[in-house]
Structures are given as structure tokens and as C-alpha cells.
Amino acid sequence: MRRLPSVIAVTPLRRPLPRLACLLALAFAPVLQAAAPVALEREVNTFIGSKDDGNTFPGASAPFGLIQVSPIGEHYAGWRYDDPKIRGFGHSFLSGAGCWEQGGQVSVLPVTGSIGKGGDFNTDDAKSFDHKRYASPYTHDGEIGQAGYYKVRLTGYGGIDAEATARTRAAAERYTFSVDAGTGHVLVNVGQANERHSVIGSVIDVVGDRVVEGKLVTKSFCGGHQYTTWFRLEFDRPFKAFGTWGEEGGLAGARHRMEGEQKPSGAWLSFDTGKNRTVTAISAISHVDAEGARNNLRSEGMQGGKLLGFEQMRSQSQQQWRRELATTRVQGGTPDDRTVFYSALYHALLQPLTGSDADGRYRGYDDAIHRADGWTYYEYFSLWDTYRAQNQWLALTRPQVARDIGRSLLAINEQGGWLPRWGYANFETNIMTGDPVTPFLVDLWRFGALAGREGEAYTALRRNAFEQPPLNSRHAGRSGNPGYVDNGYVAYDRAFPSKGMDVDPHHGGSATLEYALADCALAQMADGLGHADDASTLRARGGNWHKVWDPQVRDEETGMSGFPRPRMDDGKWYVPSDGHYSPRSHHGFHEGTAWQYQWLAQQDVPGLVQAMHGREQAGKRLDAFFAYDALVQSPLTAARKEWVVGPYSYYNQYRYNPNNEPDLHAPWMYTLIGQPWKTATVVRAAQQLFTNAPNGVTGNDDLGTMSAWYLFSAIGLYPAVPGSGQFLLHTPRFTQVEVDLGTGRTLTLAADGADGRTLQYVQGVRVDGKDHAPVWLDWTRLQQGGRIDFALAAQAPTRGWGTQVDALPRSFCATPGAVLE
């Protein structure tokens, strides 16, 4: 689900590195790379996306970390940049997700004041321990958000500095109380989490004089299933007093508390801060069991039986980020360009989350405990989003992570009985529609990430493409398959029973388009594995977008005709109650309109162009969709004026929506019809929406999807056609980008004079010194590394590079007889 910032911009945040230092780093980049990695973790601005509805979190996490420590405010995703108070620091977050009921478990806040009968925290009144009530104001002055490190000044309770850092499975928090505090308390609230994230039950135990541990059961993600989080916190010194609270209030000296649904529950720990003002806690969580949390803490938060110090934890976390970020090196651009780029790279590397504990155990979709021996099990898969860009970024740059992701999805299929769509913790939520797991896994196959498991993957994908999960399964799968397999379309039926918030027949028009795209991707895998009959069937089904294309539908304002339209179960076109179907309406399309979904047939460009009455008319339709003339006249500002800008503006629209996934590939439709200079214009305009500010992301970041889109847009490559292995070439934003491919090879993309503040067009391309006429490169060539040089021009070469039909990639599922002319 998508959200879009409603504010155009705010004052950019303080640079993580001084501007002069950034310039020096650029000037001496080769020297720095040879001597020691640049401190790229400080180039990251974790506040990007934390305002409006970007839904990112500013706190600390490791790459693909199991645990995150970040502030909790008033928003369901955790905290917004303009929230007035911090309720606590939670230990589980997603970056950029759009559903409520997510994260914030184990809300911890340092406070001062008296705890007891009639005290500041009145043990006779359970409401005193509501984190909405005891939340602290804070200041953005001095606030730091870097990769692996977060710091904020709480201005309540006499002033307290709160810091956080995180490794993969353990984290550290350091609280520095005011000089006159005398006694500082740490509240560990397990009865509350992020706003709208209901705690169903909780247990907390105070162990000895340094430890608190327990578990809490929460609902998940748009009304999903319940799941359990186990946790453990160990402090660097003993607390002098403690107690617990529950529904009846607080009890000093109590060590145990167990409470039910939405009941107050937690513990307080009191420290002598007269001589030592700092309190450090090392924390760990697990989705397996209590021993999993303990072992995670021992493995990554201790050394030689002793807790690691905060600075040790921070150093290890930020060194890991430095290594990860240094795998992609940019030259050129402004300091803000660099921060936006490395912040996007950071956000693209946060998910999926590590699901296996330090001992390899993880909780599977059968709710049993399994072990990942020699590999990492991942969880939290927003596939409807990530199949479009983030999956390909990981496969291109981190093949080992991609292999483990593929293996995790196959484990889910084996243990849960079906492949996931939106997998949260250890169960399927059935959020969103279509068939995202197919293009996701086919791309992993194409990139070699399923090597040795191709047969297992194909068997699972084929079953998903032709069948349905049983009624007693949590998985909805392709719920429109019965009609789709027989008739070629998903019937539009708003009364169709759902296993979750979403189900395909509720959005029959867009589901048909998604199924057809997935079928074409799977046809290529079937062809590659020698399943000729399946390949033929699936290839034909890749053209099923025709089944929901009504040539008679006319857009009244533009006069253009021919658009997708949902069909009913009897095969007739859907007609709304007023008797007039508009391609700008919401009927039958998930978070979009027919105008926006018409481009989701990139597997069959010749057929789509034919349906739009030829290349010239298809180009004019794209021009209207993007407001192309306005973009040329005002490339730095037109996108905010002409395109969809509302956070919930899915419907009654006909313009490009840069804030939602169905349109992510649409700028490259120009390239696929032989007008690559227009792709350059649109991409440059869209890049202006990504800024070094809290609202500097388009819509929800959706577990790194929008960030990955930006990365590809900035380096000059984009994977527009799922399953094809084709990367389309376009104008880079930087003069040079070096991308390590995780195999010892490096891909260098260079564009002399590239400037993100102006319109520039590709005049020609050279690959390893040789002229390259096609507008694309395939995966087999990219994985070899090498160098791609772009020659840029200020004037659009309307008859030059990439405009000839023979320079365009072949559509695997092209309509028979349809050709580009």
C-alpha cells in the first residue's frame, strides 16, 4: 500500500559529513579506496522517508538485521519526523511498509522521577505506565541518523541523551541522564508497541540485578495472524531497584508479570546515576524461543562472557555498513546527490530481515522450528513491491543474499504448503494482489540464484500458476485461477470471499494483467529448463492482457480509445451503476486506474503498441500520461505539479503515479517503443522527488522498493521486463558509478559531464570500448563486469541511438503477427 508526502520539501537536514570533507573525498576517491574505506555510513541520512508517509524508521539496524532500535511516536509505522514526542524505543521495525499493525515491540524509555504510590509514576494507577502518557518531548537539535547509529536528545525528565546501534541479531542502547538526576529509571513496556499494533499477550521477568526478558504476542500487518517475539535485555551494571506493572498498577520488587490482550504490562529498573550518568543495555530478540534471544545476545552482544560496550557495538555495526555501502562507489553529483544515493542504497539493504537465530534455527510457516545450516533464512517479503526493482538490485550486487532469499522462499513453500505473496514473520498475510512471487523467483533463476534448486522452484511455481491452495490453507495464492485458466481473465467480483484484506477477484482487471506478466516470466523459465509444452501454454497466457483490453473504451478528455477494463464472470464487460465506464475510475484495479495499469504489458510491446494504434499514437499516449511537454519546459519542478501527488490518490487519475508500484517501469516504455530520449526526460523529472529531506522518498519506500528504483535510475540501468534478464540503458545521474557484483567483478558506468540538474540524453553507448547500438544489455553480459560509457548530449537525438526497431529488445510474449514499425 502506498503513501505520498503531502509536503513538497523541508529544509535539508545537516549533512552527515561537512561539505568540504565530501568534496575532498570525491577529489581523492582513488587514494581513499586504496588506503581505507571512506566513512560512507555517515553519508547516509536515515531521516529520509520519515516524514509524511515514507514510513521509514530513523533508528539503528544492520544490513538485513533481525533487530532494529528506533523511536516510537504517533504513527503506525513507528515514528514521523514531526511527531511531538517519543513514547519509547522499539526493537522491531519494517522500512517503508504501508499496513498498520507492524513493529515497535519492547518499548523502552529512560525516565526520571518517583515511582511508587502517588509518585510521578503512580503504582496505584496503571495509566501512569501508558507510554502515550509518559512519552518524552525531544529536540531535532543534535539528532543523528547514520547507518548503524542513532542519537536523540530527550528534553523531558531533565534531559536525557539516547543512543542506539545494532548488529544483525543484537543491539545496544546507551542512555545518559542529566548531572542532577541522582536516580534514572528504564521502563520496559511489553504491553504496547507501535500505534495500532495490538499486543495480544505478554510476559516479562526480571532476572537477577542486570537482566529483563520475556515475550509478547502481537497481531500483524492489516489484521494478519498472531506471532510471538521473545526478547532479552542485559545491562552493563546492576539496577538498585525494580518492579513490574500490570492491569492493577505497579508493584515494587515484583519480578514477574503476565497480562492479556491490550493490557498494561512491563517492568521498571532503577539505577544510581549520581556518579555514573550512563546506562547501557544490550538487547536481542528472536522469533524462535527464549533461548534464541539469549543466544543471539551472547553471540553478537558479548565477548568472552562479558557484554560488549556501546562503542564496540557501534564500531562493528558501522564498519559492516561501511563495507556494504562501499560496494557501490559514485563520482560526481552534489553532496546532496551523494547522500540521497547512499541513503537509497542503505534503505534497499534493510530487507528482507534475517529470520534465523545465531544457531541457525528459525520458525517456519508450519510453526515448527527448523535450522538453516550454512545459510541465512530470511523473512518479511513484500513481493508485490520488491519484485519490480529491489529483488534485481540484490541479485545483481549480492548474489549470496539472493541465493539465500530464494532458498527461504522455497522453504516457505515446503513448510507452509504454498509460495508466499506478502510473508510477515512466519505466515502469509495475503496482502496485495496478482502473482508477484513468480516474476520474483524467475528473476532469481535468471540471475543464477536458484542454481541447484531450479527443479524444485519450477515445480512450486507451476503449481502456483495452474492451481489454488486448499481452503484450509492460510495462503490465497492465485485465487482467480479457476476462471483465469479456463477463460484467460480474472472475473471482477467484489463479493469474492477473502482470506485476508486483499483477494484477486476484488481487482479482476489488474489481477489479470499481473497474472499475464507472471505467466510470461514463467514461460521463459519453462523454456530454459526444457518444459516445451508448459512454455508454449504459458507464453500464450502471457498475452492474456488482451482479454481485458476493451478497444471501445474512450477517455473523454483526451479522446484516446482502447483501455483495460474488468470483465464479469459471464464474460461481459463491467458496467458501473451510472452506465458509463471511465478508464480513470477505480473499478477493478488495485491501487490504480486503467490509465496507469495499461502499461503493465511490457512483456508484449508489439501487441500493446498495436492495440494503441501504432508507435506514434502510443508515444502520444505516453506524452499525455507523463505531461511530457511540461517536463521538458520545467524538468526540476513539473513532476510535483503534473503527476499524482496525493498520499491516497490511487483512483480517478490518468497521470503517472511515481508513488506506487504499478507504474515503476512506465518511464522505460518510451525506450521500448524507440523513444529513449523521452525516458531520460521522465527519469530526470522523477529523480527530483528524491531529496535529502525527511519527505525525500516517493510514497511508502515499501521495504526498499522505491530506493532500489532510484538506484537503478541513477546508475543508468533498469530491469523493466520481469524474467527477461534485460536491463534497459538510460542517462546516468553521476559521472561514474562502480558497482561490485559480489563475484570479484566490477561493473563501471561512466557518463562524462552527467549533471542531475539538467536534461541530458544518450547520444551513444560503448561497452568495453566498442560501440553498442541496442538500448539494453542482458544479465549474462552484465555479470561479466566491465565498463559502459554513455556519451551525453543536451539536445534530444530523436533519430539517433536507440530509435531503430533493431535496437530494441525482443518481447518474449509478443502477440503473433504484431510488429513494431
Which residues does each predicted region cover?
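Bacterial N-terminal signal peptides that target proteins for export
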Residues: 3-21
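Bacterial N-terminal signal peptides
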Residues: 19-30
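Accessory carbohydrate-recognition regions in carbohydrate-active enzymes
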Residues: 34-391, 395-439, 445-513, 524-547, ...
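Hydrophobic, small-residue-rich alpha-helical packing segments that form membrane-like cores
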Residues: 514-518
